């Protein structure tokens, strides 16, 4: 039996999207080897869920935030001829470790994402990482941080996340889709994320403080932030203090088709974050042929080629961010070329099939060990 442990599979964040990809590949691999599989989600509602990624359907059980139920179910699954457990987040590493105590032959794979391993982990999580057979990291930068948690280098594997198959299915020359209500008129800088006070490292505030300089030359410029969170009021207040509140817009409850249309319609995508372990939203924008601006930190430089598919800027440097945006706004032909190169890179390196092939190889190695 193959077992997958996840914090949440129904959510909208990057961790949830990556988790769905992991779950889809694990279930498909199990079927190809005529093995049973069991997928558990800690935070999803207590029922049997059905989900599909890239046309591949899988089922999982939600545990409605009950750590006791989640752990007990995982240990029972391990005792039923468990071969490999894949924990989709370091927070679940201790559960995988408990499963291994109950079923000593069980092989363990733990996935990391980025910022959660940038600081020393609690001892129990660090121990679980150190004793895992494989620790996955979406970028070399994240892998380096994992190694600082006293994980042996030979156990760390870099597995870049993939573009969601829904985005892959959109042709490069697809007509402009229907935009959501509230999409602003003018030249639009798009950013996508969860705007939380605990995640100000995303750099949304820097985008706002860069706007006054840009608006002196392009008064039609608009900043559109797709997503919501507890920091929205603070960001709106910051926009008002900078005199740009009429040029900063938030959209929530956006469907997939509407989000794809936003990527298609915008001039560029910007998320000058210092805390991206990888950055799935960069892939989404690149797949729609848009130049991308990201932070010169974390895993973003492994996705964005500076001066080729977009620009990398130091976190919090509003002047450098404004300069990069000015360059793209001033030369639309160059911006389109950058976007085209980004699309080509996604098609070459970050397709879901590439991710699936790499993960299946790791699963096969662990099953045969």
Where in the sequence are the language-model features?
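Aromatic "clamp/platform" in nucleotide-sugar-dependent glycosyltransferases that forms part
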Residues: 274
